[in-house]
Amino acid sequence: MAVPKKKTSKSKRNQRHAVWKAKAATAAQRALSIGKSVLSGRAQGFVYPVAEADDSES
């Protein structure tokens, strides 16, 4: 079984953690921005099913 030979330094651990947190913050910011544009009606790249199509089938 593969095991690390030496302990990872605190600085390397903190750097990896900071990269992970930065990626998560970027993804959260993008999701919030997309949500705001959808709610405000400014979204251009989304296609939504029309509710009237569901009513006509019944």
Swiss-Prot record:
GO MF annotation, one: structural constituent of ribosome
Classification via Gene3D superfamilies: Single helix bin (1.20.5.640)
Record key words, sorted: Ribonucleoprotein, Ribosomal protein
Matches recorded under Pfam families: Ribosomal_L32p
One Gene Ontology biological process: translation
Entry superkingdom: Bacteria
Cellular component, GO annotation: large ribosomal subunit
UniProt keyword Protease present: no
Family: Belongs to the bacterial ribosomal protein bL32 family.
Family matches, as PANTHER family: 50S RIBOSOMAL PROTEIN L32, CHLOROPLASTIC, LARGE RIBOSOMAL SUBUNIT PROTEIN BL32C
Name the UniProt record assigns to this protein: Large ribosomal subunit protein bL32
Source organism per UniProt: Synechococcus sp. (strain WH7803)
